[in-house]
Design a protein with these regions (language model features):
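C-terminal motif of bacterial Sec signal peptides marking the signal peptidase cleavage site
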Residues: 15-18
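Long, low-complexity intrinsically disordered regions enriched in Ser/Thr, Asp/Glu, Pro/Gly
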Residues: 7-13
Length: 202
């Protein structure tokens, strides 16, 4: 793909995790998917935020993820938990129903592109903690090393969004290479189970 005319980034939780890089291709392959039942249930951000993250089983190695923000707006995703080396990641991909439900013409919708995002899972119990690839770090790194990984930059300066266009194998190599690179991953996202969920898991 030489040019991306429009990228629809259906990550309603951008405010929580910060603006994040997205990818045309998934981080996972069929061989490294794992399923951990500990992820199932409803989680909420620590602090005053009222947003929730709800995970349901959708298959042997797939979750349905529903994000609800402070204003009650929702976004539904296909979620896959995977292992990259010894590290677990959560790959998120917007559910097609989000586009189908838009009050727009079919011609408009064919120009919208769903993309993947991924979060490094540092722990699930007793609280869910994840980190995203830091967009600012990635911008600066690619300015210095533009051939490190195939990508497309949309916009300029601090507002620029990075869409990774590399194949899944190349994407995995890049992420694994920078697992311990200082600044490559952002501040942790800390989530705790909703009280009712905590009781049901005892």
């Amino acid at each position: 793909m030489k040019k991306i005319l429009l990228v629809l980034v259906l990550v309603a939780f951008c405010v929580v995790v910060g603006c994040i890089p997205t990818s045309i291709n998934p981080l996972y392959t069929g061989q490294d998917l794992v399923f951990d039942p500990a992820l199932l249930g409803v989680w909420r951000s620590e602090g005053d935020s009222k947003d929730t993250w709800a995970f349901e089983k959708a298959g042997d190695s797939e979750y349905k993820f529903l994000y609800t923000d402070d204003e009650g707006k929702t976004g539904q995703f296909e979620a896959h938990l995977l292992k990259l080396g010894h590290t677990r990641f959560l790959d998120l991909f917007p559910d097609e129903s989000g586009i189908e439900g838009m009050d727009r013409s079919g011609y408009y919708k064919i120009h919208l592109l769903r993309t993947h995002s991924f979060l490094k899972v540092t722990r699930i119990e007793p609280a869910l903690q994840m980190e995203s690839l830091d967009l600012k770090w990635l911008r600066e790194f690619l300015e210095k090393h533009p051939n490190a990984i195939r990508h497309h930059k949309i916009g300029e300066g601090d507002e620029a969004q990075i869409v990774l266009t590399a194949s899944t194998p190349d994407l995995r190599k890049f992420v694994e290479k920078h697992l311990k690179t200082e600044g490559a991953f952002g501040e942790p996202i800390n989530l705790k189970r909703k009280q009712s969920e905590t009781k049901s898991h005892k």
